[in-house]
């Protein structure tokens, strides 16, 4: 035995993962039942073995907001629900580049262009598609961040074009388990999401696909979602925690239906089931974890985060995120974007500091007022 927590189930799973065995649903459920401290310790060992000792930060821009025809029950941007958010069409590619440059200055290693719609269609909206391609090229050519995108469903042709343009990761979350998906979404199927992931991967892009925890799913659903992602093969697994938005079908609850301990255990199990992926803590962490708790997932297998603001809700500053990473005894990834963490922390102590997403909101408001 390479490492012993004193917990036979955890120690056995650690050894098998180190030996290259892919753990299955039975393993995931058994691990989820173990005490959190021992489970987190085992997951942390796997992170140290398979990862590089850094936490990888990504940032996003809400490049097209609201009026989405899909009915995802958690989403403030669905046209089916009255949530009061600002809506706007696809941003000018130069504005997206500006947001990417701010993300670069804030230490992001990758920058995601995100749209609120079922899919950016080359055939049905060619002008918008051309703007997407132009934005990808600008970020690719004029920054050091890796350019990612979340553009909804893709055809095979669209996936091949995006891959040829150098898109690094394609994000398309599965949100939850196959069993629970229809409780949250009715306008498309779980398999629709999987088809897009398979097309993106077949075209040569890496996959970023994950879940939202605390929507009423069971612990078994959380494991089942991770098993589905094993079959797809993801290199980045974002873990969102529900931040209920008033006006959505699940917006009337006060908080996500997951405790801090359950969250930590789920992240640890995801490390066991996806030992070589970036397990990335993303939306909802600030409202579901106290400031002095946010380092805990990074002591339980997590090694990535989304920094700055989210699509329609505020995040915390990149300086705060760097301090959380350091509190966990880790350091920010600087492989693609060799930034100075101390400079980021110093700059964001100023009240005038502006993250990429904050700046985008200014752009969006300006467009709405025209």
UniProtKB/Swiss-Prot annotation:
Protein's GO biological process: biotin biosynthetic process
Involved pathway(s): Cofactor biosynthesis; biotin biosynthesis; biotin from 7,8-diaminononanoate: step 2/2
Cofactor requirement: [4Fe-4S] cluster; [2Fe-2S] cluster
Keyword field: 2Fe-2S, 4Fe-4S, Biotin biosynthesis, Iron, Iron-sulfur, Metal-binding, S-adenosyl-L-methionine, Transferase
Catalytic activity: (4R,5S)-dethiobiotin + (sulfur carrier)-SH + 2 reduced [2Fe-2S]-[ferredoxin] + 2 S-adenosyl-L-methionine = (sulfur carrier)-H + biotin + 2 5'-deoxyadenosine + 2 L-methionine + 2 oxidized [2Fe-2S]-[ferredoxin]
Compositionally skewed regions (Low complexity) per UniProt: 352-370
Stretches for region Disordered: 328-370
Domain Radical SAM core: 50-276
Binding site for [4Fe-4S] cluster: 68, 72, 75
Primary role: Catalyzes the conversion of dethiobiotin (DTB) to biotin by the insertion of a sulfur atom into dethiobiotin via a radical-based mechanism.
Assembly, per entry: Homodimer.
Protein name: Biotin synthase
């Amino acid at each position: 035995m390479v490492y012993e927590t004193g917990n036979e189930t955890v120690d056995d799973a650690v050894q098998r993962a180190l030996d290259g065995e892919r753990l299955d649903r039975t393993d995931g459920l058994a691990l989820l039942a173990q005490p959190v401290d021992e489970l987190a310790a085992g997951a942390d060992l796997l992170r140290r073995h398979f990862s590089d000792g850094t936490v990888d930060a990504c940032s996003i821009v809400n490049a097209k907001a609201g009026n989405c025809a899909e009915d995802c029950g958690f989403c403030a941007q669905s046209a089916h629900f009255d949530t009061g958010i600002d809506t706007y069409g696809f941003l000018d590619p130069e504005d997206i580049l500006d947001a990417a440059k701010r993300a670069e200055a804030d230490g992001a290693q990758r920058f995601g262009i995100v749209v609120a719609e079922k899919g950016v269609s080359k055939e049905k909206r060619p002008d918008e598609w051309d703007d997407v391609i132009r934005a990808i090229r600008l970020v690719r050519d004029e920054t050091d961040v890796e350019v990612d995108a979340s553009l909804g469903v893709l055809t095979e042709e669209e996936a091949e074009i995006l891959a040829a343009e150098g898109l690094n990761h394609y994000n398309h979350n599965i949100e939850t388990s196959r069993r629970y998906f229809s409780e949250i979404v009715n306008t498309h199927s779980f398999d629709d999401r999987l088809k897009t992931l398979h097309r993106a991967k077949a075209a040569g892009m890496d996959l970023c696909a994950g879940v939202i925890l605390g929507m009423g799913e069971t612990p078994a659903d959380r494991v089942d979602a991770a098993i589905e992602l094993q079959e797809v093969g993801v290199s980045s697994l974002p873990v969102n925690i529900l931040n209920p938005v008033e006006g959505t079908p699940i917006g009337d609850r006060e908080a996500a239906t997951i405790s801090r301990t359950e969250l930590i255990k789920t992240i640890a199990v995801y490390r066991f089931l996806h030992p070589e992926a970036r397990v990335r803590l993303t939306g909802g962490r600030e409202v579901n974890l106290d400031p002095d708790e946010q380092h805990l997932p990074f002591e339980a297998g997590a090694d990535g985060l989304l920094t700055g603001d989210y699509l329609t809700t505020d995040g915390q500053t990149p300086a705060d995120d760097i301090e959380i990473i350091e509190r966990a005894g880790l350091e920010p990834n600087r492989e693609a974007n060799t930034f100075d963490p101390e400079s980021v922390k110093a700059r964001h102590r100023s009240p005038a500091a502006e993250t990429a997403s904050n700046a985008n909101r200014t752009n969006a408001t300006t467009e709405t007022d025209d």
